[in-house]
């Protein structure tokens, strides 16, 4: 979704990673964001620390957001995907320095158990979590990320077996 306010179009995208985390039943991890009153479900994502590779960032973010990094990378996206946040959110996120995010996405096989997942981390981003199907994923995602998620699903779909 493109930004409706031109004053933000010159801002860069924040470099980050996203993770499509699969359990043994090929269900996808989603968390409900803690910082909004609306039902905003998403897959884990986060920023890349300077000097960090995207794959290292993905595993670090997995640990930070779901309390476990038990898993392995199946695939990395072939390109960077980007999204713009709604203009009213820009001043509230990342000190207003970015218009959205550009992300490398990773398909990750979770090798732990549900009891290994702990979203009550030192800086929690989610207040609920669940496993969802590929079919349901796009219908529960916050709308401004839907186009990006469609592209990620299209790229990884054939690898989810």
Swiss-Prot record:
The GO cellular component terms are: cytoplasm
Cofactor(s) named in the record: a divalent metal cation
> What residue stretches are annotated with the Nudix hydrolase domain?
12-154
GO BP: mRNA catabolic process
Q: What is its EC number?
A: 3.6.1.-
Q: Which UniProt keywords apply?
A: Hydrolase
Q: Give the disulfide map.
A: none
Instruction: Please provide, alphabetically and separated by semicolons, the GO molecular function terms listed in this UniProt record.
Output: mRNA 5'-diphosphatase activity
Pfam families documented for this protein:
NUDIX
Q: Which residue ranges does the UniProt annotation give for the motif Nudix box?
A: 46-67
Q: Which family does it belong to?
A: Belongs to the Nudix hydrolase family. RppH subfamily.
Q: What's the stated role of this polypeptide?
A: Accelerates the degradation of transcripts by removing pyrophosphate from the 5'-end of triphosphorylated RNA, leading to a more labile monophosphorylated state that can stimulate subsequent ribonuclease cleavage.
NCBIfam families per the record?
Answer: PRK00714.1-3 (NF001936), PRK00714.1-5 (NF001938)
This chain belongs to the protein called: RNA pyrophosphohydrolase
Q: Which species is the source of this protein?
A: Rickettsia typhi (strain ATCC VR-144 / Wilmington)
Q: What is the primary gene name for this protein?
A: rppH
